[in-house]
């Protein structure tokens, strides 16, 4: 670990960031007001003080969420160090943590995992981040940066995002908000949104009800690479039954529906070029739905506590092209049973339990590819049309886990844990971790640990019976039952400063060695069944990711404070088998969508009890995007230059129940480079826009 730390200190910008972060102590000593220690639940599977959490964890509270549009997860987490927005364009945006793609981040709502990506083959971004509760229902969002496979298993390789919703209330209460976004340029679509939250007792102290929902709409941009037309709606209901003071049953159900529309000549280019072939694009829409239900039992048995949950999500994707609905309608059904127990014994606190998962995928598989020739505007075009046949596949897995938080003293805590996952296809996998927290004094702490993580291949990737079309039907990808789980070994160490005034700073160094990375590559041969270009999945990828994350909150006085965030990330591909569209090895290049430098700073001004304002500056560095089916044969990869945006916002409270938000976002009208599908930028930023939002509580 010593050599690991020394390798970072040679970077002078990082040394400066560390020095700046801990200068908060000088200002904090002048502040006398005390703040309550934040409580988190994700790092250890149970409630604990943030300063004792065995992980690098950040919190976004509701007050922070309300200061800017946050209809998507990417918007809500924009200032968290180590978190970056990824995706092939703005319509397929997603989040990545510490350089790993979105598939490696586990998204949970109230501790229940959700993952509907299998319902969206050929690109699953742009949807998962929209399947979140409306803002008025969210209490806070906890973000764990780094692997949590020892507690949560597969998908938690990069980190965990846990959205904590508000508890049911013992008295009737509620809130509602409506908002509007107006762009400075007519090429961008103006959007509006609204959501509500209602909670209260049906039978006092026994039966409580909570209902919340929301909707947002944005018309299509008139710029290539801009936003599609979006319609997003959701509704959720929760019943809480408390037969005794120590037992609670919670029944919950909801539905989420997201529709996207793209038109050639607007957000979609008129044509798509692949090699020497030029195809006319068609108007299309995508309808993605997610239905879910859960039943949870929480109990305090005096000597221990428990939580049992049975939940299911069902997601489907439907595509309509040029007015004709595609017969292919992929549907994934995930059913999960969770059991978790918390047991204190002397200076030990045990969290242990198990999990059973069953996934059923219904989708069409390619059985052949027809070549269709037609004449458009006097020009002959030939395109591939895949022919599908419906297939069903199921995969189940079970797991057992245990973690022991050992409290050696008020100063030193050590967490040891492991999880055994048994997958139907690839057998048993162990994921241990060790994490230590040492409080040097009342203000300074050092924490760090080492963990092993894994990600199981998806059903399509594992199953020989699924053949997925790619390159608009010009290629096919076969599943491979011999795939291994992707694995990583992760190390991190943090120095943390916190003060009773609310001042805090954290500097984290991390290192990830990643192997068995799953990639699909062109074999150089045609598929004997369909005649299309043959791709296959294999475990060939290796990579290393290391970096520094800095965050700080500095209160100058009761009226002024500042939030700072900086991330340095150095990722490197280490496999010759990872190749570009032109057949050139990508070894030595950074991972996709991972800027080396990113930073944000927000100056907050609390004028009085009614009025507050902020100014935010954010920078994102240069990024690359490279894979076997991106760009053309002339380019090894595509690049997107760095850029800076500036926002200004204000909140005015008319009274304790009514408030108004107003913000000017991207004041400098930075929209990024022109989209260039042949080797340059792949998306545009929203330009200058004006946002207003009215909040009412009752």
Stretches found by the model and what they are:
Residues 515, 619-629, 651-698:
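C-terminal beta-signal and adjacent terminal beta-strands/loops
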Residues 177, 407-413, 510-513, 532-629, ...:
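Gram-negative outer-membrane beta-barrel transporters
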Residues 96, 113-145:
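Short acidic/polar hinge/loop motifs at secondary-structure boundaries
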Residues 244, 252-253, 355, 383-384, ...:
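Structural signature of Gram-negative outer-membrane beta-barrels, strongest in the C-terminal barrel
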Residues 73-76, 93-96, 108-110, 128-131, ...:
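N-terminal periplasmic accessory domains that precede
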Residues 74-116, 139:
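Extracytoplasmic beta-strand/coil segments of soluble accessory domains associated
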Residues 334-342, 388-393, 399-401, 480-484, ...:
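Outer membrane beta-barrel strand-and-loop segments of large Gram-negative receptors
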Residues 169-288, 516:
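Periplasmic-side early beta-strands and strand-to-turn transitions of outer-membrane beta-barrels
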């Amino acid at each position: 670990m010593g050599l690991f730390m020394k390798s970072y200190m040679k970077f002078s910008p990082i040394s400066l960031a560390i020095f700046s972060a801990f200068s908060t102590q000088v200002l904090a000593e002048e502040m006398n007001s005390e703040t309550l220690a934040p409580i988190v639940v994700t790092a250890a599977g149970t409630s604990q003080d943030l300063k004792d959490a065995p992980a690098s964890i950040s919190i976004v509270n509701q007050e922070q969420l309300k200061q800017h549009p946050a209809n998507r997860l990417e918007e809500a987490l924009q200032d968290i160090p180590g978190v970056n927005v990824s995706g092939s364009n703005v319509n397929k945006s997603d989040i990545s943590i510490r350089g790993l793609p979105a598939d490696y981040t586990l998204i949970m709502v109230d501790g229940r995992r959700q993952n509907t990506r299998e319902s969206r083959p050929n690109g699953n971004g742009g949807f998962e981040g929209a399947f979140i509760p409306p803002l008025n229902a969210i209490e806070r969002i906890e973000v764990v940066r780094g692997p949590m496979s020892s507690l949560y298993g597969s998908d938690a390789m990069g980190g965990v995002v846990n959205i904590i919703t508000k508890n049911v209330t013992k008295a009737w209460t509620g809130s509602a908000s409506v908002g509007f976004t107006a762009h400075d340029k007519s090429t961008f679509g103006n959007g509006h949104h609204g959501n509500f939250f209602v909670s209260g007792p049906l039978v006092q102290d026994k039966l409580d009800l909570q209902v919340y929902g929301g909707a947002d709409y944005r018309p299509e941009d008139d710029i290539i690479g801009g936003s599609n037309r979006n319609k997003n709606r959701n509704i959720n209901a929760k019943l809480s039954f408390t037969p005794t003071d120590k037992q609670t049953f919670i029944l919950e159900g909801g539905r989420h529906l997201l529709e996207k529309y793209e038109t050639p000549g607007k957000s979609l280019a008129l044509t798509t070029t692949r090699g020497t072939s030029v195809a006319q694009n068609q108007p299309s829409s995508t309808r993605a739905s997610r239905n879910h239900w859960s039943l949870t039992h929480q109990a305090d048995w005096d000597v221990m506590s428990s939580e049992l949950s049975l939940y299911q999500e069902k997601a489907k994707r439907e595509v309509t092209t040029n007015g004709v609905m595609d017969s292919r309608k992929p549907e994934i059904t995930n059913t999960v049973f969770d059991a978790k127990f918390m047991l204190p014994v002397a200076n030990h606190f045990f969290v242990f339990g198990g999990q059973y998962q069953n996934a059923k995928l219904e989708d069409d598989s390619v059985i052949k590819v027809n070549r269709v020739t037609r004449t458009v505007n006097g020009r002959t075009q030939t395109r591939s049309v895949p022919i599908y046949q419906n297939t069903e596949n199921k995969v189940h897995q079970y797991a057992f886990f245990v973690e022991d938080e050992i409290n050696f003293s008020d100063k030193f805590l050590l967490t040891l844990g492991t999880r055994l996952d048994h997958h139907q296809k690839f057998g048993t996998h162990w994921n241990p971790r060790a994490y230590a927290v040492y409080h040097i004094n009342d203000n300074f702490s050092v924490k760090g640990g080492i963990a092993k993580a894994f990600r199981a291949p998806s059903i399509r990737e594992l199953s020989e019976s699924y053949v997925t079309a790619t390159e608009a039907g010009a290629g096919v990808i076969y599943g491979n039952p011999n795939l291994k789980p992707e694995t990583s070994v992760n190390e991190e160490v943090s120095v943390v400063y916190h003060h009773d005034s609310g001042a805090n700073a954290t500097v984290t160094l991390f290192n990830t060695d990643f192997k068995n990375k799953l990639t699909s590559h062109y074999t150089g041969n045609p598929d004997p069944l369909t005649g299309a270009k043959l791709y296959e999945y294999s475990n060939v990828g290796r990579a290393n990711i290391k970096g520094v994350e800095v965050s700080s909150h500095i209160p100058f006085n009761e009226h002024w404070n500042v939030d700072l965030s900086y991330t340095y990330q150095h990722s490197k591909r280490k496999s010759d088998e990872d190749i570009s569209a032109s057949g050139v090895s990508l070894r030595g290049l950074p991972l996709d969508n991972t800027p080396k430098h990113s930073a944000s700073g927000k100056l907050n001004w609390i004028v009085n009890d009614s009025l507050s304002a902020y100014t935010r500056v954010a920078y994102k560095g240069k990024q690359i995007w490279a894979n076997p089916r991106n760009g053309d044969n002339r380019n090894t990869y595509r690049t997107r230059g760095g850029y800076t945006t500036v926002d200004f916002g204000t909140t005015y409270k008319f009274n304790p129940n009514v408030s108004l938000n107003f913000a000017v976002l991207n004041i400098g009208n930075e929209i990024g480079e022109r989209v260039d599908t042949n080797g340059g930028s792949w998306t545009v930023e929203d330009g200058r826009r004006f946002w207003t939002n009215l909040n009412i509580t009752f």
